[in-house]
Every structure is written in structure tokens, then in C-alpha cells.
């Protein structure tokens, strides 16, 4: 008798891509979702995805990071 056991050893985070209808599963080590947009147009995201460290925002670009599935 052969028994195969599959264990999920880690939580996998899912982050939205630029179009929120689509998402991707983040690779190991990238445990944040982010959304980047221009300060002048805050309702129009420029980029979304997975990241390891949330970048600092600037006068022109704002980053919003979170750590739950599809929160970006």
C-alpha cells in the first residue's frame, strides 16, 4: 500500500494584477500586495502585484501595500 500525503507548508498570497479581474499567486518571500498610482490621478492604478517590501511613496507616485488576498 502506498500513501501519498500532500502538505501545504506555507500560506500563498494572491494579489490582483493591473486589471483586478485577474490575480496571481505570489512567489515565496513576496508577502505583500501593492498598488501604485500617480498622486495626480489616485483613482487610476498604474501597477499592481506582489512585493517583498513596500516602497516609499514620493511626491509623484504613491504606493499602497497590504497583506491579505486580493487586497490591492
Curated annotation (Swiss-Prot):
Belongs to the three-finger toxin family. Short-chain subfamily. Type IA cytotoxin sub-subfamily. GO terms for molecular function: toxin activity. Monomer in solution; Homodimer and oligomer in the presence of negatively charged lipids forming a pore with a size ranging between 20 and 30 Angstroms. Expressed by the venom gland. Disulfide bonds join 15-33, 26-50, 54-65, 66-71. CDD domains: TFP_snake_toxin. It is found in: Secreted. Keywords: Cardiotoxin, Cytolysis, Disulfide bond, Secreted, Signal, Toxin. The lineage of its organism: Eukaryota, Metazoa, Chordata, Craniata, Vertebrata. GO terms for cellular component: extracellular region. Shows cytolytic activity on many different cells by forming a pore in lipid membranes. In vivo, increases heart rate or kills the animal by cardiac arrest. In addition, it binds to heparin with high affinity, interacts with Kv channel-interacting protein 1 (KCNIP1) in a calcium-independent manner, and binds to integrin alpha-V/beta-3 (ITGAV/ITGB3) with moderate affinity. Preferentially binds acidic phospholipids like phosphatidylserine, phosphatidic acid and phosphatidyl glycerol. This is Cytotoxin 9. Residues 1-12 form the signal peptide.
Amino acid at each position: 500500500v502506498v500513501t501519498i500525503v500532500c502538505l501545504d507548508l506555507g500560506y500563498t498570497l494572491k494579489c490582483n494584477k493591473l486589471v483586478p479581474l485577474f490575480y496571481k499567486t505570489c512567489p515565496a518571500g513576496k508577502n505583500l500586495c501593492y498598488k501604485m498610482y500617480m498622486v495626480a490621478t489616485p483613482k487610476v492604478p498604474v501597477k499592481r502585484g506582489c512585493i517583498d517590501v513596500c516602497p516609499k511613496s514620493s511626491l509623484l507616485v504613491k504606493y499602497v501595500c497590504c497583506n491579505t488576498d486580493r487586497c490591492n
